[in-house]
A protein has these predicted regions:
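Extracellular glycan-modifying ectodomains
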Residues: 1-143
Length: 143
């Protein structure tokens, strides 16, 4: 647990294959091979659904709290990586190399963060408004 500015809490665990702190610091971006493997898995899931009559498949990824509210992260740890984050790198890979409809919602949700709080201050999850705005985007895209 990291206590940020204005007492915002950030949970930065390390668990199998994941390291939220390294994600925030941009030190563990996916390799080209890892991106290709993940993209292939998503395409297989899409194909499974399409083979069963689903007419539309769109894969969404919501950003984490550290991404949207980095202004509340404490002075340390600093971002030390150069360039894009892990998910930004993967989103670019998907756009350039995959025919799966894919959307990383960072830019879309960021425009709401100046006016609204989309994540809980003392929790890692989106609040109801963040969930609603995300859901509305999905419904809008699917209709």
């Amino acid at each position: 647990m990291v206590i940020g500015e204005d007492n915002w809490l950030f949970y930065l665990p390390e668990r199998e294959g994941e390291n939220a702190m390294a994600d925030y610091q941009k030190t563990n971006v996916y390799t080209l091979e890892q991106s290709a493997e993940i993209a292939s898995g998503i395409a297989k899931v899409r194909d499974w659904f399409l083979d069963r009559g689903v007419k539309q498949f769109h894969y969404y990824v919501a950003p984490n709290k550290e991404t949207l509210y980095s202004k509340y992260m404490p002075e340390k740890p600093r971002v030390i990586g150069i360039g894009d984050s892990r998910m930004e790198t993967f989103a670019k890979y998907m756009k350039e190399n995959s025919d799966v409809e894919f959307d990383f919602l960072e830019d879309y949700l960021r425009e709401f963060t100046e006016k609204y709080q989309l994540f809980r201050k003392y929790d890692t999850h989106m609040n109801n408004l963040g969930g609603y705005i995300t859901n509305e985007k999905i419904v809008q895209d699917m209709t």
